[in-house]
Amino acid sequence: LQTNGTLITEEWCALFRENNFLVGVSIDGPEDIHDAYRRNKGGGPTFGKVVEGVSLLKQERVEFNTLSTVNRLSEGRGTEVYRFMKSLGSRFMQFLPVLEHTKKGPVTGRDIIVPPGTPGASLAQWSVSAKGFGRFMNDVFDEWVLNDVGRYYVQLFDVALAQWAGVPPALCSFGEPFGEALGVEHN
């Protein structure tokens, strides 16, 4: 189950624990990184509620991992984000690059998110650059390989190492051909 963690209660935790759920919590890093783009419907910050949800999962002994999006704001802060996830108690981490495309809307002239390949679209200003994502993951790797191999798990590293050892890839982006997995998007 993947959640933003803002509505986790003791009752939800009991259901998760009794049914052996693994709960993925979406959190992008420390408060300033997380709250830059993860806002509630009213436009307010969500960091405090997410951290409360994680605390409740830990208190109620529900296994969880974290999923963090890497954007333009976080691209130079890989070590900091990784250490923050460890401080939350996350032993299994996923880091995904934000790569969204925008185009000026015909009526408002405001940027709207569009599918990649849309004529006239460009990479959104909040998207992580290729070099930025590489630097982020290199920084995470340097910290992980020096201090945490076998104690903390980063999905991208685990999949790469497994494939190197001949294990079929668990991520579609590592497979041949790329793109055999279905993705469901909100838009």
Segments and roles (model prediction):
Residues 1-31:
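Conserved SAM/AdoMet-binding glycine-rich loop
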Residues 23-24, 50-54:
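A conserved non-catalytic segment of reverse transcriptases
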Residues 36-48, 55, 59-187:
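Radical SAM enzyme [4Fe-4S]-AdoMet core and its adjacent flexible, acidic
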